[in-house]
Amino acid sequence: MAKNTLSSRFRKVDIDEYDENKFVDDQLQEEPAEPQGPDEAEVDSLIRQGELLRAFQSALRNSPVNSKNQVAKERTQAIVLKVLTSFKSNEIEKAVNTLDPNGIDLLMKYIYKGFEKPTENSSAILLQWHEKAFVIGGLGSIVRVLTSRKTV
């Protein structure tokens, strides 16, 4: 009998390393060390100055959609919810009209995320936002939000 058959070196080879169908997560690249999302101080300042439309656009800018950083996502959700609840009901339509189709989808994602964790009076306000966003984005916007893998 040969001496090589008693060896167990073959068990140390990772055969999955050579599989061409192996799943590789693209998100594994280095994430930035600083938290992503809108600048909370800037958004708060704009709200205090009464520039709600600029605060709205600033809050939706740089959303951590592709990030796995849950802290940044929750922080951004809180900022967006604060901006959405600051609007008066007659100003909502004007704000929604400033968004492109991707912005409408992003807004709908934040609306549905707000429905998941309701606060004091947020559901009524979010329903108003949902109504106005639905008029512009249509049913396709809802379907895209509910089937999207990129969460906020």
UniProtKB/Swiss-Prot annotation:
GO terms for cellular component: Arp2/3 protein complex; cell projection; cytoplasm; nucleus; site of double-strand break. Signal peptide: none annotated. InterPro entries: ARPC5, ARPC5_sf. The keyword Nucleus applies. Keywords: Actin-binding, Cell projection, Cytoplasm, Cytoskeleton, Nucleus. The keyword Nucleus applies. Its main location: cytoplasm. GO terms for molecular function: actin filament binding. Residues 21-44 are annotated as: Disordered. GO terms for biological process: Arp2/3 complex-mediated actin nucleation; cell migration; regulation of actin filament polymerization. It holds the Pfam family P16-Arc. It is found in: Cytoplasm, Cytoskeleton; Cell projection; Nucleus. Residues 27-43 have a biased composition (Acidic residues). Belongs to the ARPC5 family. Component of the Arp2/3 complex composed of actr2/arp2, actr3/arp3, arpc1 (arpc1a or arpc1b), arpc2, arpc3, arpc4 and arpc5. Component of the Arp2/3 complex, a multiprotein complex that mediates actin polymerization upon stimulation by nucleation-promoting factor (NPF). The Arp2/3 complex mediates the formation of branched actin networks in the cytoplasm, providing the force for cell motility. In addition to its role in the cytoplasmic cytoskeleton, the Arp2/3 complex also promotes actin polymerization in the nucleus, thereby regulating gene transcription and repair of damaged DNA. This is Actin-related protein 2/3 complex subunit 5-B. It comes from Xenopus laevis. The lineage of its organism: Eukaryota, Metazoa, Chordata, Craniata, Vertebrata. The gene is arpc5-b.
